[in-house]
Amino acid sequence: MNFLDRNEFNFQPSEKVVKAIKDFDPETLCFYTRIYDEGKKSIVTVRLSEIYNVPEEQILLGYGGEEMLKNAIHYFLMKGENKTILIPEFSWWYYNRVAGECGGSFQMYPLYETEDTFAYNVDEVIEYTNRIHPRMLLLASPNNPTGNSLTSEEIGRIMENIPSDTMVFVDEAYASFITTDTDYIAPLVMKYNNLIIARTLSKFYGLPGLRVGFGFIGAGHDMFLSYCNKYLGYNRFSEAVALAALESDEHYRNVADKMEWDRQLFKKELGNLPGFKVYK
């Protein structure tokens, strides 16, 4: 049975991932990693720093994208009196749930339906953020479930025109499905201190059961990094598999192409049925 409620992976992992699992030495789990003594978080954050050209100290690592989200919301909403997060009108239900966990509240900005898709109105996002002045602004790109996304230029325009004390969290869990470009990430997080961009191995890399998420944050957040970091290190098995996944882009890009073919077939066939409207 294929479950469709959490966008899980119904294809095979890459050969490199399978090999990393088979070759993993279980005795490794008898010891903590010592990389924290070198001033690093993980062998994974070191590799991510090389891939994304972001300083290792500005890279976050956690138990899936979920932990990236929870850590950010819990930390920033619990500091000070402003406990409001601004989220998309149609979005993952979990966003407002996490805000409620730490006594926060949420308000929503609208998304707009076009002929066969939804879209952000960047000017309205800016206007809402300046008027409400939330502690956090959440942008999902692409947004789940509507699928609309923001360009790097649009993210930059939002960052340039909102209060600098509003922390912006960009959820890019599905970003690799719509673009191979990641060159915009480093310039954005190096320019804007109030920005977090979060990604995961759960969607494009098809490893939701591994529970590995990562993110990038602007400079000047040593206390938040200390809040997130694991002094005794991360799961060493997960680290080994994560490294293999990050070296398997060709495999997962081929899988994504198959998914897109299936999606277009689904769109065509379902769109031919009376009473159904299919969105891009």
Task: List PLM regions with ranges.
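Short acidic capping loops at alpha-helix termini that bridge into adjacent secondary structure
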Residues: P55-I59, K83-T84, D165, E172, ...
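Structural scaffold positions in well-ordered secondary structure
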Residues: L4, L137, D171-A173, A198, ...
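PLP-dependent aminotransferase class I/II
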Residues: Q12-S14, C102, N194-N272, V278
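N-terminal small-domain helix-loop-helix segment of the aminotransferase-like
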Residues: M1-M68
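PLP-dependent aminotransferase-like
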Residues: Y75-L139
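Short, conserved loop/helix-junction motifs that constitute active-site signature segments
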Residues: M78-G80, M159-P163, L188-Y192
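Glycine/small-residue-rich loop that forms an oxyanion/phosphate-binding "nest" at active or ligand-binding sites
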Residues: G65-H74, V170-Y174, I178-T179, L188
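Active-site phosphate-binding strand-loop segment of PLP-dependent enzymes
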Residues: D116-T179
